[in-house]
Amino acid sequence: MGKPKELPEEDKQLAKQAEKALNNENDTKKSTATELKNLVFEQPIEFGYNEEFRAFARVSIKNHHEVYALDSLQFHDYLFQLYDEKTQNVLPKLTYDSVNEYLATYSRVHGQQQNVVMRVGINQGKYYLDLCNDQWQVVEVTKDGWQITKDSPVWFYRTNDMAALPIPNHHGGNQNLLELGSYLNFKSDNSLDLITGWLMGSFLVNSSRPILVIQGIAGAGKTTASRLIRGVVDPAKQKHSISRPKLTVDSLAIDAIHQHTLVYDNFSAGTITAEISDMLCTMATNQSYSKRALYTNSDEVLVKLGRSIIINGIDDLAKRQDLLDRSIILEIEAPKKRRT
């Protein structure tokens, strides 16, 4: 992962001020903020931050680990539940805000930079796939095979919309893949081979991935095909695809931060401007996007935006040569017989 980035000086000062404020309490009575802070540090919890200096916590719960962003609803609920269980009192909002800010700063100052990823990660030559189930099970893949584990060295972060993948079958074959092909009405005979290549590319880490472009007439089932293909590697609970009336570079970057696989529905040739085309290529080739660092006015960080991408529409979408070179383009036909 390389040498961790140097923390902005103002964050270091903020940490000192926050710690001093929390510890400057009356000797005879602890504040609720200090009480909550002490409760947190009594738990089996590890703090760190990602390449954007966003703070994360890795919490040991029962026989597995869960990773929360400190600015997420999951960590909010974790702190409220912890305080309720230990004190049988309601956690005041001001106390939560104060302690959360302290912990976020603590994570960036005292924690280590971590490889925080969604769905797929790599560590020391081993690949890891987050199944996103309630047991927080992960598939560990090596050159010798694969196994299910709950103790991944990779910090897997989840969004609320990520759905679970099934437990892999050691005795499985390609029958399910062939069955998938039977639901997809693509024109070319080698379409399933190309889709298989795209699916395999979706599991790559720190590498370029092809963009899957699905084109066809209205009613051909482009949206359904996109959802089915995405569901093999990165199923969603509700947000199976993204449809925006106006696409911008910033909206693409935000989408990439929150999803491992991006499906853009009902694109038109006019949607893919030169700027958007360049950004799609940046995402497909795992290049970096520059953005302002948290809590600073001038510092910037480079965010890796390597993502798996599917776009669909009626028009010829990949007209610019750089986007065309990075795309698998498939034509889909309207189904001759509807499945009901």
How would you label these PLM feature ranges?
Residues V301-R307, D316, Q321-T340:
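Phosphate-sensing "switch" segment of ASCE/P-loop ATPases
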Residues D234, S277-E300:
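Conserved catalytic/switch belt of AAA+ P-loop NTPases
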Residues I61, G145-H258:
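P-loop NTPase catalytic core of nucleic-acid-dependent motor ATPases
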Residues L204-N206, A253-I257, I272-A274, E300-L305, ...:
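Conserved catalytic network of the ASCE P-loop NTPase/AAA+ motor domain
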Residues V67, L199, I229, V263-D265, ...:
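Conserved RecA-like P-loop NTPase ATPase core
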Residues H258-T261, S288-S290, K304-I309:
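Loop/turn-to-beta-strand initiation segments
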Residues T261-A284, I314-D325:
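Conserved AAA+/SF3 P-loop NTPase catalytic/coupling segment centered on the Walker-B
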Residues M1-H171, I254-D255:
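N-terminal nucleic-acid engagement/recognition segments and initiation subdomains in replication
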